[in-house]
Regions:
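Alpha-helical adaptor scaffolds
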Residues: 49-129
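Helix-start (N-cap) detector for alpha-helical repeat units in TPR-like alpha-solenoids
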Residues: 7, 11-14, 48-49, 89-90, ...
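N-terminal alpha-helical interaction modules that lie
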Residues: 1-48, 54, 170-172
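Canonical positions in the second alpha-helix
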Residues: 39-40, 80-81, 115-116, 149-153
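Short coil/turn linking the two alpha-helices of tandem helical-hairpin repeats
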Residues: 15, 21-29, 55, 59-66, ...
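Extracytoplasmic/secreted proteins, especially bacterial periplasmic and envelope-associated proteins
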Residues: 9, 13, 20, 32-36, ...
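Short aromatic loop motif centered on NTY/YTY
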Residues: 118-145, 149
Protein backbone atom coordinates (compact mmCIF):
# COMPACT_ATOMS: atom_id res chain seq x y z
CA UNK A 1 0.00 0.00 0.00
CA UNK A 2 1.25 3.47 -0.88
CA UNK A 3 1.90 5.97 1.85
CA UNK A 4 0.54 9.51 1.74
CA UNK A 5 3.70 11.03 0.22
CA UNK A 6 3.86 8.42 -2.53
CA UNK A 7 0.19 9.01 -3.39
CA UNK A 8 0.74 12.77 -3.55
CA UNK A 9 3.79 12.33 -5.76
CA UNK A 10 1.90 10.04 -8.14
CA UNK A 11 -1.15 12.34 -8.27
CA UNK A 12 1.00 15.40 -8.97
CA UNK A 13 2.95 13.58 -11.68
CA UNK A 14 -0.31 12.50 -13.33
CA UNK A 15 -1.65 16.06 -13.16
CA UNK A 16 1.57 17.41 -14.66
CA UNK A 17 1.42 14.89 -17.50
CA UNK A 18 -2.23 15.56 -18.30
CA UNK A 19 -1.91 19.32 -18.05
CA UNK A 20 1.50 20.02 -19.56
CA UNK A 21 2.99 16.82 -20.83
CA UNK A 22 0.43 15.96 -23.50
CA UNK A 23 0.95 17.70 -26.85
CA UNK A 24 -2.61 17.45 -28.03
CA UNK A 25 -4.55 18.04 -24.84
CA UNK A 26 -7.84 16.24 -25.01
CA UNK A 27 -11.03 18.09 -24.22
CA UNK A 28 -11.77 15.74 -21.36
CA UNK A 29 -8.48 16.32 -19.58
CA UNK A 30 -9.56 19.30 -17.45
CA UNK A 31 -12.32 17.42 -15.63
CA UNK A 32 -9.87 14.57 -15.03
CA UNK A 33 -7.31 17.01 -13.66
CA UNK A 34 -9.94 18.64 -11.44
CA UNK A 35 -10.79 15.24 -9.97
CA UNK A 36 -7.10 14.52 -9.41
CA UNK A 37 -6.73 17.84 -7.58
CA UNK A 38 -9.65 16.85 -5.36
CA UNK A 39 -7.74 13.68 -4.50
CA UNK A 40 -4.61 15.72 -3.74
CA UNK A 41 -6.62 17.97 -1.44
CA UNK A 42 -8.04 15.00 0.46
CA UNK A 43 -4.45 14.14 1.33
CA UNK A 44 -3.12 17.70 1.68
CA UNK A 45 -5.79 20.34 2.38
CA UNK A 46 -3.11 23.02 2.90
CA UNK A 47 -1.80 22.75 -0.67
CA UNK A 48 -2.45 26.30 -1.92
CA UNK A 49 -1.30 25.54 -5.45
CA UNK A 50 -3.71 22.61 -5.77
CA UNK A 51 -6.65 24.72 -4.57
CA UNK A 52 -5.82 27.62 -6.87
CA UNK A 53 -5.13 25.47 -9.93
CA UNK A 54 -8.31 23.44 -9.42
CA UNK A 55 -10.45 26.58 -9.05
CA UNK A 56 -8.82 28.13 -12.12
CA UNK A 57 -9.56 24.98 -14.14
CA UNK A 58 -13.21 25.06 -13.03
CA UNK A 59 -13.43 28.70 -14.11
CA UNK A 60 -11.82 27.78 -17.45
CA UNK A 61 -14.38 25.03 -17.93
CA UNK A 62 -17.19 27.52 -17.23
CA UNK A 63 -15.80 29.84 -19.92
CA UNK A 64 -14.86 27.20 -22.50
CA UNK A 65 -18.03 25.15 -22.13
CA UNK A 66 -20.30 28.12 -21.41
CA UNK A 67 -21.51 26.13 -18.43
CA UNK A 68 -22.19 28.16 -15.28
CA UNK A 69 -22.33 25.04 -13.13
CA UNK A 70 -18.52 25.00 -13.28
CA UNK A 71 -18.44 28.59 -12.04
CA UNK A 72 -20.71 27.78 -9.10
CA UNK A 73 -18.52 24.78 -8.33
CA UNK A 74 -15.44 27.03 -8.46
CA UNK A 75 -17.05 29.47 -6.03
CA UNK A 76 -17.95 26.64 -3.65
CA UNK A 77 -14.36 25.39 -3.65
CA UNK A 78 -12.97 28.92 -3.35
CA UNK A 79 -14.93 29.37 -0.14
CA UNK A 80 -13.81 25.97 1.12
CA UNK A 81 -10.19 26.89 0.32
CA UNK A 82 -10.45 29.95 2.54
CA UNK A 83 -12.28 28.09 5.31
CA UNK A 84 -9.49 25.50 5.48
CA UNK A 85 -6.63 28.00 5.03
CA UNK A 86 -7.59 31.18 6.90
CA UNK A 87 -4.13 31.99 8.25
CA UNK A 88 -2.17 34.15 5.85
CA UNK A 89 -2.87 36.53 3.03
CA UNK A 90 -2.79 34.05 0.14
CA UNK A 91 -6.27 32.51 0.30
CA UNK A 92 -7.88 35.92 0.89
CA UNK A 93 -5.98 37.38 -2.05
CA UNK A 94 -6.99 34.49 -4.29
CA UNK A 95 -10.66 34.82 -3.35
CA UNK A 96 -10.36 38.57 -4.00
CA UNK A 97 -8.99 37.76 -7.43
CA UNK A 98 -11.76 35.21 -7.95
CA UNK A 99 -14.41 37.90 -7.38
CA UNK A 100 -12.45 40.48 -9.35
CA UNK A 101 -11.87 38.38 -12.47
CA UNK A 102 -13.65 35.04 -12.49
CA UNK A 103 -17.01 35.84 -10.93
CA UNK A 104 -17.11 39.64 -10.99
CA UNK A 105 -18.35 41.16 -7.76
CA UNK A 106 -16.24 44.19 -6.87
CA UNK A 107 -17.75 44.55 -3.38
CA UNK A 108 -16.75 41.01 -2.47
CA UNK A 109 -13.37 41.42 -4.18
CA UNK A 110 -12.73 44.53 -2.08
CA UNK A 111 -13.69 42.73 1.11
CA UNK A 112 -11.31 39.85 0.48
CA UNK A 113 -8.43 42.06 -0.65
CA UNK A 114 -8.92 44.16 2.49
CA UNK A 115 -8.61 40.99 4.55
CA UNK A 116 -5.51 39.96 2.61
CA UNK A 117 -3.59 43.19 3.22
CA UNK A 118 -4.07 42.87 6.97
CA UNK A 119 -1.45 40.14 6.91
CA UNK A 120 2.10 41.44 7.23
CA UNK A 121 3.36 39.05 4.57
CA UNK A 122 0.95 40.35 1.92
CA UNK A 123 3.06 41.46 -1.05
CA UNK A 124 2.76 44.89 -2.61
CA UNK A 125 0.92 43.34 -5.58
CA UNK A 126 -2.00 42.51 -3.27
CA UNK A 127 -2.19 46.19 -2.32
CA UNK A 128 -2.09 47.13 -6.01
CA UNK A 129 -5.06 44.84 -6.67
CA UNK A 130 -7.07 46.42 -3.86
CA UNK A 131 -6.31 49.93 -5.11
CA UNK A 132 -7.36 48.93 -8.65
CA UNK A 133 -10.62 47.35 -7.44
CA UNK A 134 -11.49 50.49 -5.47
CA UNK A 135 -10.69 52.70 -8.44
CA UNK A 136 -12.64 50.48 -10.87
CA UNK A 137 -15.66 50.47 -8.59
CA UNK A 138 -15.66 54.28 -8.58
CA UNK A 139 -14.49 54.67 -4.98
CA UNK A 140 -11.68 57.13 -5.61
CA UNK A 141 -11.40 58.23 -1.97
CA UNK A 142 -10.95 54.68 -0.79
CA UNK A 143 -8.35 54.08 -3.54
CA UNK A 144 -6.46 57.16 -2.31
CA UNK A 145 -6.62 55.91 1.29
CA UNK A 146 -5.26 52.52 0.24
CA UNK A 147 -2.47 54.22 -1.74
CA UNK A 148 -1.46 56.02 1.45
CA UNK A 149 -1.67 52.82 3.48
CA UNK A 150 0.43 50.99 0.88
CA UNK A 151 3.06 53.73 0.90
CA UNK A 152 3.28 53.49 4.68
CA UNK A 153 4.26 49.83 4.26
CA UNK A 154 6.12 50.10 0.93
CA UNK A 155 7.38 53.73 0.87
CA UNK A 156 9.13 53.65 -2.49
CA UNK A 157 6.69 51.56 -4.48
CA UNK A 158 6.63 53.26 -7.91
CA UNK A 159 3.17 51.98 -8.92
CA UNK A 160 1.55 53.35 -5.78
CA UNK A 161 3.45 56.65 -5.90
CA UNK A 162 2.27 57.20 -9.49
CA UNK A 163 -1.28 55.97 -8.79
CA UNK A 164 -1.62 58.38 -5.85
CA UNK A 165 -0.35 61.27 -7.99
CA UNK A 166 -2.85 60.35 -10.70
CA UNK A 167 -5.80 59.95 -8.32
CA UNK A 168 -5.13 63.30 -6.66
CA UNK A 169 -4.52 65.15 -9.94
CA UNK A 170 -7.03 66.85 -12.19
CA UNK A 171 -6.68 63.91 -14.61
CA UNK A 172 -7.80 61.50 -11.91
CA UNK A 173 -11.00 63.46 -11.28
Amino acid sequence: MQDREQKLKLLNKTIETLWHGVKDSKEGDYPKIINLYKEVLKLDAKNNDAWENMIWLMWSMAINKKDTSWLFEAEKFAKRYLALNPNGYRAYEYIGQFYRVMYPDLKLATRYYESAIRWKDAPVSTHHSLIAVCENSGDKLRAIDYCKLTLARFPKDPYTVNKLKFLTSKEGN
